[in-house]
């Protein structure tokens, strides 16, 4: 489990706890939440644990060694740290499946390590494909690893495609177009501001942007939902996963979040996957595919819901959506720049250094400044370099333009 203390990680471990006959946790990676990590170690007794930060490894070691009696695991895990440590855990010899729940581009290298080791991947970290699709897809084909989408929208598409013929050379989701697939419709809740008028967004606060009406998620992805960048990034991910060009991947606002996405086939029939907005459903399917595991989870009752509604997204309200389409069509290193610039812009917003409305502005400026250096056939090092450049570029922009786009100036 990559990112065990985050939203995806905790829900994945809940599934493992509920289904002990099907799943055994052998490796955990985490950031700095040692209290929760230690509880996870006690409960799941993994063979290896990796910390992203080397400086807190001694503290973890000391705290684990001090455990006594029933609190002490039967065997303490092998402890590693840093990038090398994350890669060791991601490619751990006894793991069959790696669930990638590390937020952002930080999940790229350990995910690649898992792929190179031939592990199947339950992909909840969309940035891996968005930033490095041209690198990841060839590695999947070389290693034979299977990529199973673990986020709700791409899981929905994947589930709908189970009844369609796959080409023999396709290894599940590796960008090879599925015969008969005409169109993908990604559903979006509309995020925290779906019921706000566009002109009212100038009053948007951090609290407003991080309060999602339907889903329980981390702060970063909740802000991405509010800007609709999350859905724009999912368009790029769907392109790499399912092989359709961008003109055949649509976004539709569906406030109830019951239909998680739809596919249209060549005969004009449309298949949809439905369920309550609960991330455990797509995570479980990615973990158990091609099987279905019986659960006691809440069952969907359409009579209880009453109605399902849909409408087109407002591009003036959600400029990030069009930025994502443009970056995807530009291809090469541009999606990596878009992704990194967005991560930095959202971080700056959460730090109260820019206003919500400035998130798309700084992203667009970074993408525009990258056009002259765009690489169409990037290698891994190219992706890493432009990721670093884009983050620095965004911070530099905000520093230079602080008189215009800081929160303090905005309040004046």
Swiss-Prot record:
Binding of NADPH, residues: 5-8, 31-33, 125, 127, 218
MF (Gene Ontology): 1-deoxy-D-xylulose-5-phosphate reductoisomerase activity; manganese ion binding; NADPH binding
EC class name: oxidoreductase
Cell cycle as UniProt keyword: no
Domain of life: Bacteria
Functional pathway: Isoprenoid biosynthesis; isopentenyl diphosphate biosynthesis via DXP pathway; isopentenyl diphosphate from 1-deoxy-D-xylulose 5-phosphate: step 1/6
Residues that, per the record, bind 1-deoxy-D-xylulose 5-phosphate: 126, 152-153, 189, 212, 225, 230-231, 234
Gene Ontology biological-process entries: isopentenyl diphosphate biosynthetic process, methylerythritol 4-phosphate pathway involved in terpenoid biosynthetic process
Family assignment from sequence similarity: Belongs to the DXR family.
Name of the protein in question: 1-deoxy-D-xylulose 5-phosphate reductoisomerase
The organism of origin for this protein: Prochlorococcus marinus (strain SARG / CCMP1375 / SS120)
Lineage of source species: Bacteria, Bacillati, Cyanobacteriota, Cyanophyceae, Synechococcales
Gene name tied to this protein: dxr
């Amino acid at each position: 489990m990559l990112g065990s203390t985050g939203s995806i990680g905790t829900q994945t471990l809940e599934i493992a706890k509920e289904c002990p006959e099907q799943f055994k946790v052998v490796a955990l990676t985490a950031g700095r939440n040692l209290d929760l990590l230690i509880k996870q170690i006690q409960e799941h007794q993994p063979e290896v644990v990796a910390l992203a930060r080397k400086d807190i490894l001694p503290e973890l070691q000391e705290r684990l060694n001090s455990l006594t009696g029933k609190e002490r695991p039967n065997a303490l895990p092998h402890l590693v740290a840093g990038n090398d440590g994350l890669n060791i855990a991601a490619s751990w010899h006894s793991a069959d499946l790696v669930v990638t729940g590390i937020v952002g581009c930080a999940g790229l290298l350990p995910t690649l390590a898992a792929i190179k080791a031939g592990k199947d991947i339950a992909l909840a970290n969309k940035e891996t494909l968005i930033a490095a699709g041209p690198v990841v897809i060839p590695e999947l084909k070389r290693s034979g690893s299977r990529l199973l989408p673990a986020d709700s929208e791409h899981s929905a598409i994947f589930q709908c495609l189970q009844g369609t013929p796959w080409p023999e050379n396709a290894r599940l989701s590796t960008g090879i177009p599925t015969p008969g697939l005409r169109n993908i419709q990604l559903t979006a809740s509309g995020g925290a501001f779906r019921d706000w008028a566009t002109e009212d967004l100038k009053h948007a606060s951090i609290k407003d942007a991080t309060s999602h009406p339907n889903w329980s998620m981390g702060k970063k992805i909740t802000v991405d939902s509010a800007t609709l960048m999350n859905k724009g990034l999912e368009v790029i991910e769907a392109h790499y996963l399912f092989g359709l060009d961008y003109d055949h991947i649509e976004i539709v606002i569906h406030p109830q979040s019951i239909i998680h996405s739809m596919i249209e086939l060549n005969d004009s029939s449309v298949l949809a996957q439905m369920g309550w907005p609960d991330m455990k459903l797509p995570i479980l399917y990615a973990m158990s595919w091609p099987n279905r595991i019986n659960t006691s989870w809440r069952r969907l009752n359409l009579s209880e819901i009453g109605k399902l509604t849909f409408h087109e997204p407002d591009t003036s309200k959600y400029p990030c959506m069009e930025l994502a389409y443009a970056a995807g069509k530009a291809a090469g290193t541009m999606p990596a720049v878009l992704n990194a610039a967005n991560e930095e812009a959202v971080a700056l917003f959460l730090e109260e250094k820019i206003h919500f409305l400035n998130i798309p502005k700084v992203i667009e400026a970074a993408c525009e400044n990258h056009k002259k250096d765009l690489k169409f056939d990037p290698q891994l090092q190219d992706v890493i370099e432009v990721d670093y450049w884009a983050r620095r570029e965004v911070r530099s922009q905000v520093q230079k333009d602080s008189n215009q786009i800081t929160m303090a100036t905005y309040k004046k």
